[in-house]
Amino acid sequence: MEPVAIYSRTQERADEFAKQHGLPLAFSDFDEMTQKVDAVYIASPTGMHHAQALQALEGGRHVLGEKSMGASLAQEQGSYRAAKERGIIAMEAMRHLHTPQQQIIRDALPMIGTIRYAHIQMLQYSGRYDQFKNGTILNAFRPELGNSAIAGIGVYCLEFALDLFGEPSSYSGNSVYLSNGFEGSGAIQMSYDSMIVDLAYSKIVQSVSPTVIHGEKGSITIN
């Protein structure tokens, strides 16, 4: 794969990025850019992911999209459906699922016997939260742009659990919302036939506690 083009909402910023990274093409028109490439990597704000992905897919271009591919289940399904109809690829960029570390964890699961419980967490105090508390609401804390704790950070816990354990038989969850409706923290419990998996995620508290998977013969601790 060879990066050849960049799109930005302003030509000046596109030109600056292209020069900095040695890209031959720079665009401020998304449609024009998609006509010059074979595939598109979408790393814009979450609220724009679906529209841009659909635009590229409808133009016959493969899409690798930053998480989440859409601000809702319907949007995500719409992108994958558009790709399937055209025989092209739409894929969410979940890099950590394809790392050697993730494979080590997969390989270690049988060593701890029948798994009964797992606690998976990512609690990371956002550097933008202090500004929110002081009255300045930056884009990362604006729910109208498709942003939330689950979309920004909780998705890593969720995809990690689904990769290791598959889909649960049932699930439930609760969230903590800030004054503007932004989801600041959340917790999900996933129930399986013989085990329970708890997920915790936040952009407004910090924790260094590890993720732990407990089996009948031992446990796996992940820092």
Short names for language-model regions:
Residues 96-169:
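Predominantly a Rossmann-like dinucleotide-binding segment in NAD(P)-dependent oxidoreductases
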Residues 21-82:
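Beta-loop-alpha module in the N-terminal Rossmann-like domain of NAD(P)-dependent dehydrogenases
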Residues 14, 52, 79, 105, ...:
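Aromatic/hydrophobic pocket-lining residues that form π-stacking "cages" and hydrophobic walls in ligand
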Residues 2-5, 38-40, 90, 147:
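Short active-site oxyanion
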Residues 157-223:
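Contiguous beta-strand/loop segments that form the cofactor/metal-binding neighborhood of enzyme cores
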Residues 27, 65, 90-92, 222:
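Hydrophobic residues in well-ordered beta-strands that form the structural core
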Residues 1-21:
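N-terminal Rossmann-like dinucleotide-binding module
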Residues 3, 77-95, 114-117:
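Rossmann-fold dehydrogenase core element
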